[in-house]
Amino acid sequence: MAKIAAIAPDETDEIIYLLNEQSDVNELKKLPKNKLRLALPTVCRRVDKFKPLIETLLAQGYKKWEIGNYWGLSVLPKNGIDLSFDAPLYMLNTQAMQMAKEMNAGRVTLSVEDQLDNLGLIAAQAPLPVTMVVYQDAALFTSAACIRSNACKDCPRGEKWLKLEKDGQKYQALSKDCQTMLFAEQPLCFAVEAAEIKADYYRVDFVYKSYEAAKAAQVWNKVRRFEDAANCRKANLYRCL
């Protein structure tokens, strides 16, 4: 919550909050409901454990939702909600976007793995509103396998970060809820390029790694001016296939 508190709500169109099995419903009440979009995790091993939480939040009037995997469609109603597709649901052409629209998505997110030319092309021709991620600690992969060495029965299950290195490249692995996510040391930042992409929404993401409030505010203020944060990566933006 400290990261969010550092950013004035009136500077945002909405706040995306990533749910987990232990999410505290009372914590959500501290955020403006009209701006809150609830996101389901990309990988979920225990769908049944999420259902009571989702049903509670729907009953409390939360209408904005986001999914990063098709399992989310099995636990959310087909109608009556504002549904967004996150970047792991690849939108690499307008045909994929049209299919998302037919699946009742009201918004899609451009892929952080795409090239700059294609991002501009499909954003201009999109059949529904698009979001462009301009800053994110994007997971290199998410696995439903646990990286920890201890037995499951002895595991505290809380968040644990591990540092890894291979071929001179440094990585950070997040172990949480029996899953593993691998991250590069540097975040993605497409702020400079975003100035040329006519997206409907631009997204700054502080979801996984820990950010002090002052650091989050610094990044937020910089990328809002379409300026890159320091020490960032560009992923595949300029890669030629």
Where is each model-derived feature located?
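Active-site pocket-lining/capping segments in soluble small-molecule metabolic enzymes
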Residues: 1-99, 103-241
